[in-house]
Design a protein with these regions (language model features):
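A glycine-anchored, Pro-Gly-centered beta-turn/N-cap motif
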Residues: 58, 62-70
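Short beta-strand segments within Ig-like beta-sandwich modules, predominantly Fibronectin type-III
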Residues: 50-55
Length: 174
């Protein structure tokens, strides 16, 4: 009687393992539409699965499940220089990416960007910042890199009605 119970238990465990294995083997596809820019998106599901999708390679095969975006980089070339901007969240529509079995999920990210100004004042100090928002509602960092290096802040001149420079300065990041 005990051997029979052991075989039944092993059969149930084997069927459960097989069912989980089959569920994990279903595949779907993800492709990125980043306009004329190049994109690299890192995804992670709730467990251990990670995937990296690039815009130039067509649709990439991934497991059919729900993913979360972890990092997104957009780069483009202009006059032989490579400009790059990164997104680490918040993610907008990319916060939950559902990939269905044998279907292609297209993610529209990056440009054209929406630039939203953020202005705050504390006493005599006026802080001007901006938010860079992509097509999926993803929020990018407020700075870009050029050829892999940091850029200097933009320069500004404050002039009066006659064109006289009242103050000259340079923006700084951070």
């Amino acid at each position: 009687m005990k051997k029979k119970d052991i075989f039944i238990s092993l059969g149930i465990i084997g069927a459960a393992v097989l069912a989980v294995w089959v569920c994990l083997q279903t595949k779907g596809y993800v492709q990125i539409d980043a306009g004329r820019a190049d994109a690299e998106l890192r995804l992670k599901d709730g467990w251990f699965t990670k995937a990296m999708i690039t815009s130039g390679g067509g649709a990439a095969e991934v497991g059919a499940r729900v993913f979360n975006a972890r990092r997104l980089g957009i780069s483009a070339k202009l006059n032989s220089q490579t400009w790059r901007i990164e997104c680490l969240g918040p993610w907008g529509e990319l916060s939950r990416i559902k990939v269905k079995s044998n279907e292609t999920t297209t993610l529209r990210v990056g440009p054209p960007f929406l630039i939203k100004p953020r202005i705050s004042r504390s006493g005599a100090v006026l802080a001007i910042d901006y938010a860079i928002v992509g097509r999926a509602g993803e929020l990018y960092q407020s700075f870009a890199t050029k050829d892999g290096g940091a850029m200097s802040g933009a320069k500004i001149n404050i002039v009066d009605e006659a064109g006289n420079v009242l103050h000259a300065g340079q923006f700084s990041y951070g």
